[in-house]
Amino acid sequence: MPFCHYGPLLVLKINAFAKREGAKRGKDAYDILSLVRSCAEGPEAVVAAFGEEKREDNSGLEMALRTLEDHFTDADRLGPALAASFYLGSRAQGDSALRLREDLVTVAHALLNA
C-alpha cells in the first residue's frame, strides 16, 4: 500500500540525494531507480506522476530538477556512480554496473522531460 504518491516521493528522494553527505547518497540515488523500476503500474506512471509535480508547482521541484541535471544525466556523473556502488558494492565495475548507471541516466532524462 503506497504511503505517498510517486511524484512527491521522487522529489523527496532526489532532494535527499542533493542535501546528504556520505554513504546515504548512494542509497538515495539507487532508490530513485528502484522506485521507477518497481512501480506496479509501470515506469511510465512514475514518470507521469513526476511530471504532475511540475504542473502542481511543487516547492521542492526546482532543486530536484537541478539535481537531476547536475548529477544524473551521464553515466559518469555522481548519481549513477553512487547508485552502482551502493547496489553492487565491490562489484561496481563491469557490465552490470554500466547497465545500472545507464538505466539511471535514462530515468533522469525521462523525469527531466516529463
Language model features: what each stretch is:
Residues L112-N113:
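Charged, long alpha-helical assembly modules
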Residues A92:
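Acidic, glycine-rich loop-and-beta core segments that form the ion-binding/anion-interacting portion
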